[in-house]
UniProtKB/Swiss-Prot annotation:
GO molecular function: phosphotransferase activity, alcohol group as acceptor
Gene3D superfamilies: 3.40.1190.20
Pfam hit, one: PfkB
The protein's name in its UniProt record: Uncharacterized protein C16C9.01c
């Protein structure tokens, strides 16, 4: 079935998965929305009110066993999700074993159904202005070449690329260099970066700036105007421009070879429950806000705030509205949390961040 072309501001090629989570002690919870695509979409949705939220796209393949409770939760987001009926198969389910120390073991319970460029073409999502892609370097290049074949790269969409953990190996260093030319934001986490560089992951947090410096040496983006945004867990993120770039934000500049640090949102004790999907939400928010503002610092600040909502529960943050019809997530306004985050940055961080807060963004 072909779908009509849509006016799409954001799309993710990440998958939709329904998670089952088992904890130490044997407790289980089921029917939890998961998958990189779901979290990337919510990262974008947090910064997009209705009706504009209908321009945020994702493909959800509904198997014969798709739960109504999941459909209701997805529909409550009021996005441009495209549902494909696939009654001959089971919906993609995942099993998660979550240990008390935070370690997570994941495996698929039913076959996965990856999303590629032909799927975006079929569903009318191909001409999105921003695209979130999570895959290995070789497939990333292939997807981007397919996008070019279908005509989207002529429109120069903004692309954020998350490399998959299993592909972050030293032997993929060469293809990584080719892949980076296609993305506007390259966003690995600190562990993936260490694995790519052949460095013990026990040193990943302490050497994160070294990783950014290594990635900066490559051409990022078709015109070397791209960014490395390394996600460093509870330590926030690091932002670096391609070294051949003359990149500058509108008022706040990240000079070539300078690496800018943005801390994570300061969370209340006991408010962090599950960090799954935080990186995906970060990337979804980052690419959309970079497209909208042209300011990598502002985009990453908003992405950091988006991630903070994802870690407060298993699955997606709870969506409600206040008496004025404003979106609330876990009972809070995303804009209020951003305001508090900027206030924290103004008192704790470098002059570039203080300059950003002076602008009132």
């Amino acid at each position: 079935m072909d779908y009509p072309s849509k006016d799409v501001e954001f799309v993710t090629t990440g998958m939709f998965i329904i998670d089952e989570i088992e904890f130490d002690g044997g407790k289980k919870i089921k029917d939890i929305i998961g998958g990189a695509g779901s979290f990337a979409l919510i990262g974008a949705r947090l910064w997009t009110s209705e009706p504009e939220s209908q321009q945020l796209g994702m493909i959800v393949d509904k198997g014969s066993d798709f739960p109504q409770v999941i459909l209701d939760e997805l529909n409550d987001l009021h996005t441009g999700i495209v549902y494909r009926e696939t009654p001959w198969r089971k919906t993609t389910y995942g099993y998660n074993r979550l240990r008390d120390n935070g370690f997570r073991l994941f495996e698929y319970l039913t076959p996965k159904k990856p999303i590629r460029a032909p799927d975006l073409l079929e569903t009318g999502l191909i001409y999105a202005k921003t695209i979130h892609i999570i895959t290995n370097p070789k497939t990333f290049v292939s997807v981007c070449e397919e996008l070019a074949k279908y005509g989207n790269l002529k429109n120069r969409p903004k692309i954020v690329w998350e490399p998959t953990p299993e592909s972050c190996l030293p032997e993929n260093w060469h293809i990584l260099q080719k892949a980076l030319k296609y993305c506007d934001i390259f966003s690995p986490n600190e562990v993936d970066s260490a694995n790519l560089l052949g460095i013990d992951i026990s040193e990943s947090k302490s050497r994160a700036k070294e990783f950014v410096s290594a990635f900066q040496e490559f051409q990022i983006g078709h015109d070397s105007q791209g960014w490395v945004v390394l996600r460093n867990g509870s330590d926030g993120c690091l932002i670096g421009a391609c070294t051949s770039s003359t990149n500058a934000t509108s008022d706040a500049v990240v000079p070539v070879r300078e690496i800018l640090h943005l801390p994570s949102v300061q969370m209340k004790n006991g408010s962090v429950l599950d960090t799954t999907g935080a990186g995906n939400a970060f990337c979804g928010a980052a690419i959309l806000e970079y497209y909208r503002t042209g300011n990598i610092i502002e985009a990453c600040a908003k992405a950091t705030v988006a991630a903070s909502f994802v870690i407060q529960q298993h699955g997606l943050p709870a969506h409600t509205k206040n008496s004025e019809g404003i979106d609330l997530w876990n009972g809070e306004s995303v804009f209020q949390r951003l305001k508090e985050y900027y206030e924290f940055l103004a008192s704790h961080e470098a002059s570039a961040i203080k300059e950003l807060t002076k602008r009132g963004v």
